[in-house]
Amino acid sequence: YHGGTHPKGKTVPYMNECDVPKFSYDYQAPLGEFGQVRLSYHQLKLQHLFYQEFTSEITAAKTVLSKEAEVQTPEDVETLRYVVRADEQGHGFLYLNNYQDHVETIDQTDFCVTIQSDLGEVRFPQNGSLNLAKDACAILPYWFSLEGHLLKYATAQLITKAVSSHATYYFFSKIRGMSGEFVFP
């Protein structure tokens, strides 16, 4: 998560010179060797806020792979990468990924995803189609309880919530290439 610098050796110029880099071991970490805050830090921060706040919802869910995921290769940038995590009652999250290490991806355009659930069918989006920018990813909630108000789905990523004495506030983030939509049954 944070790059660094090996200290200079006392008896030889480099410590462990056969096993590790001479001095720098930054590796494009979210926080650079000299404290630089990179874009990946901000992207991970949003994801970590989500996982921290909604741990119980995520851990109660099981992963369901798409048919495409079972045969997809890393070089296949044409096929949408997605999986679902759903709990036994039918609440869940749609994970979309348009990034692949060491492969040049393209914008995913004009697609939709339909999920069958015990609570009912959910089509992302209800009408029309979605777009997901090159190298973007998203975790979209469906059949999600917002303090007793059931959200059928959102095409914005749930980030965290804040609770005050008078209300609970939910925070979402727009996904690159995607229009934000919130649908209640």
Where are these regions (language model features)?
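Carbohydrate-binding surfaces of carbohydrate-active enzymes
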Residues: 1-185
